[in-house]
Amino acid sequence: MASNGKGPIAPNQFPPPVDPQKEFIKRGLDAEDELIEVGVAIVGGATAGLATANRLLQLLADDPETLEKLGEVPVAIIEKAKSCGAHALSGAVIRPESLHELFPDLSREDWRKERFAFGEVKKEAVYMLPSATAKLKIPTPPNFKNHGNEIISVAALARYQQRLAEEAGAYVLTETAGMQLIVQDGAVVGVRSGDKGRGKENEELRNFEPGSDMKARYTVLAEGCWGHLTGAAIKEFNLGEGKEPQVWELGVKEVWKVPKPLDRLIHTIGPWPLKLSAKYGQIGGTWLYPMKDETTGDDLVSIGFVVDLEYADATTSAHDLLQQFKLHPLVKGILEGGERVAWGAKALPAGGYWSMPKLSMPGAVIVGDAAGMVDTVALKGVHHCVTSGRLAAEAIYNSLKTGAPLSAYEDAIEKSSVGKEMYQVRNTRQPFQKGFIRGAPMVNIAIMTKGKVPGGRLAWHTNDSTPLFIGDTADGYPKPDGKYIFDKLSSVYISGNVTRDDAPNHIRVQKSVPREIAEGWKWMCPAGVYEIPDDAPATGPVEVIVNYTNCVQCGAITAKGGRLTPPEGGDGPLYTIT
């Protein structure tokens, strides 16, 4: 393992220059004539946040007396992207029950007509890939079974949820970043939006618009994975006490228009193109999902690669591993002759049950991915986002009606399918921190026993505490040809990413770091944000160039030694079918 002469080098030895409580917690509200007052402020306009809004408005529609308690603007949704769902990305296959519970009048045919659903899973296959050319079909593991589930786009689902919420009376503020959580007298009392029109040095430009305080009776943190305000709230209210640290994975996805339909859902579980040796610390897998657009008749395929951010080889790159995976005959037979029509990248929480923070605090609750509600064994989280949003809305409504504490939301989660499913896989990912070969037997035991293992609770260590070395994973990455294999910058381009060249830098990292850390950031980032100068020394500290305008806000840097903060509202990708 490479070192600086003083032992192994891990990203957490070079923490980002940020103090979440000092910077992202605002103490007290502005004067009454300088703020916006709403009933419920929801930070994040994607699956979980919009589920909260829609369910709450359903309940209030039949209860004008309670609705009146929330004032002229009963529900406001703050979304940093240009539109709801524009920063949302997932595979995605959803267990349909959660959407049926939220929208009981909608059939699955209705979902497809609204173009956020693309067909029921009727056939599926799981393969092991021993090498770049070989494949071995294996029985579908119980947790992987998807028969009867629905293939969807979370970006498109969010747009549909937004429309329903607005029709029901929600006030949706897009292009608005939630920059600070407002705390007064020990309770969350709202959110402050970010400034617009600042320059590179944070100076006010001609078009400068200051942020404003949004006072709220209740606040819902639905920021998704890595939740900026959620992270500050966890520290402020000690919501992580007695919990394991959160850990992450990074997924990179493409959508292809193909000449012939894929007739089944496919997962692969490696080891190729990852390295099997424990020293590389690589765990990951892939998906290929058929998507039939009933409106246009187009046959589409969602393809993605997910890698655990626990890895040790600094040259591990989820984007390049996806390009390498596409060279396998299994994949080429599906995609060849087609056209890539979309690309995106997003981190996802992988810590599971023991890493979920306390879900409520005075004045606020946390929902969905922001709370870590992802079952990485079943590769599922969207249905948990929907259910948690629904239960949060019901807890807020009951609090309004009866004065019940928001902690009732936590009890509801524990008793729901979310709590039960997350608990059953509570110890199934931690063993992989010892490597695939050593960890797999314990993982299988944990799956078979529904989480029962010696000791009862397996611990995590943070992704950024794993020492990095400069390995040879990158030696296998193919060269881009612009037709089938793509580089990072052309991929960022088709994501619709737009960030002002003179905007302030929203990424916090130490600029001078050992080569191992710099290489790790360079390869990790799917958008090519981190660059090492050509004349940088081969060993020792290097000065990292941060091309922050490339950023698609995937959040992976937070797992590997930096910190993503919200850019100016409206910046970032414009995902449509991811």
Model-based region annotation:
Residues 71-72, 372-378, 390, 394-437, ...:
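Active-site-proximal substrate-binding core of FAD-dependent oxidoreductases
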Residues 1-41, 55-74, 198, 491-515, ...:
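Extreme N-terminal leader/targeting segments of oxidoreductases
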Residues 518-578:
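Iron-sulfur cluster-binding cysteine motifs and their immediate structural context
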Residues 49:
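N-terminal Rossmann-fold NAD(P) dinucleotide-binding loop
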Residues 44-46, 80, 154:
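Glycine-rich Rossmann-fold phosphate-binding loop(s) that bind the pyrophosphate
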Residues 58, 67-71, 155, 164-333, ...:
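Predominantly flavin-linked oxidoreductase catalytic cores and closely associated redox partners
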Residues 55, 59, 71-131:
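N-terminal FAD cofactor-binding segment of flavoenzymes
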Residues 345-376, 490-502, 512-524, 531:
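FAD-binding beta-loop-beta segment adjacent to the flavin cofactor pocket
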